[in-house]
Regions:
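Intrinsically disordered, polybasic Lys/Arg-rich low-complexity tracts
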Residues: 1-59
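Polytopic alpha-helical membrane-helix bundles and their juxtamembrane interface segments
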Residues: 63-166, 175-318
Length: 318
């Protein structure tokens, strides 16, 4: 009986062990199936997310890529300016003009009882037109090279944000030189008048930059800056017109043909800049690149035409 009881107890314990092992195996199978289900659900979720991302990428519009003028165009422009400078230095006449400074002086004949002052003009220096033109072309070449190399990243940022300060730096420097060349060709030789006209061109560039910056920041046109640019742009135009009229009325002669063409080129270039500036508010952000290219193209054409006109007008056979 004792042995039978022992055998029964052993069978009970073996049954319990088998039950425990079967339960543990079933629990392991259940956990494995849960892990598989979780992996499958995560894989489905990932596939859905990737499909959604792909569909969103396919449906979302591509952002416009801002590109500036290529280095080849800048290099070709610099080469053109260098060639024109070489032609001007070799083929143009050595026509010199004097720079005067107006001042008051004592009239020795009339100053008997007291000092009598009269207006006078003192010649300061003589300068050749061709070297002024060569200087303009050389400075333009340097600015073109800088804008394509050292200032290339600033060019991209300017187009991206809708404000191009480097363009207005170029406008101020080369525009002031253009005005002085055109003024000297037409007989405006007073130092103060020449510098006033050059300073007015720099003010136009400053007001244009302020207008562009405020328009990009607020989206509203800055009327004060625009009016300031237009008013200051009238100063060099009126000075050139008065000088041309004085030549006809008091000089009883007409200026040479290249002097009239030079004035026309300068006024057309200045008018185009003001026209494009006035239309800045109607230009979208994505059209700013086209506007910047138009500025650069017209500026290059104005300098090239002015150089060709003066070379042809002051040409001398070798």
């Amino acid at each position: 009986m004792a042995t039978s009881n022992k055998s029964k107890a052993k069978t009970k314990t073996t049954k319990k062990v088998t039950k425990k092992s079967s339960a543990s195996s079933t629990s392991k199978k259940a956990t494995a199936s849960k892990v598989k289900q979780s992996k499958a659900s995560s894989a489905k979720a990932n596939s859905k997310s990737t499909s959604v991302d792909k569909s969103s990428l396919a449906t979302s519009p591509a952002k416009p890529v801002v590109k500036v003028e290529g280095s080849k165009s800048f290099i070709s422009t610099a080469v053109i300016f260098v060639v024109l400078a070489s032609l001007a230095s070799y083929f143009m006449k050595a026509t010199t003009v004097q720079i005067f400074l107006g001042h008051l002086t004592k009239n020795e004949l009339a100053s008997t009882a007291g000092t009598v002052l009269v207006a006078a003009a003192r010649p300061l220096c003589e300068i050749q037109i061709k070297w002024m033109l060569v200087g303009l072309l050389v400075v333009s070449t340097i600015l073109v090279i800088l804008r394509s190399t050292v200032w290339g990243r600033r060019e991209q940022q300017g187009i991206k944000f809708g404000v191009q300060p480097l363009r207005w730096v170029d406008f101020a420097i080369t525009g002031a030189l253009m005005f002085q060349i055109v003024a000297l060709v037409n007989g405006l030789q007073d130092l103060v008048a020449l510098k006033l006209g050059a300073f007015s061109i720099a003010l136009v560039a400053y007001f244009a930059w302020m207008y562009e910056r405020e328009n990009a920041a607020t989206g509203k046109p800055a009327r004060a800056s625009l009016i300031g640019a237009k008013v200051t742009a009238l100063i060099p135009v009126l000075m050139l017109g008065t000088t041309m009229l004085g030549t006809i009325v008091y000089g009883i002669v007409r200026s040479p043909w290249y002097a009239y063409v030079a004035v026309a080129v300068f006024v057309a270039w200045l008018g185009f800049v003001l026209l494009k500036l006035n239309r800045t508010t109607s230009i979208g952000k994505h059209d700013y690149l086209a506007s910047d290219r138009a500025y650069n193209t017209v500026s290059i054409l104005a300098k090239v035409i002015l150089a060709l006109v003066l070379i042809a007008g002051l040409y001398v056979k070798k």
